[in-house]
Amino acid sequence: GIMDTLKNLAKTAGKGALQSLLNKASCKLSGQC
């Protein structure tokens, strides 16, 4: 249903945001930004 679709979208968006945060953090830690 629509709720399932929205939940999946939220999960995907959350994963993407987490991934980019992790990428930023790791590049700052390694000094490669």
UniProtKB/Swiss-Prot annotation:
Cited Pfam families: Antimicrobial_2
One GO process term, biological-process aspect: killing of cells of another organism
Location of the protein in the cell: Secreted
InterPro entries from the UniProt entry: Antimicrobial_frog_2 (IPR012521)
GO cellular component terms given for this protein: extracellular region
Disulfide bridge partners, by residue number: C27-C33
Superkingdom of origin: Eukaryota
Tissue: Expressed by the skin glands.
Function in brief: Shows antibacterial activity against representative Gram-negative and Gram-positive bacterial species, and hemolytic activity.
UniProt name for this protein: Brevinin-2E
Source organism of the structure: Pelophylax lessonae
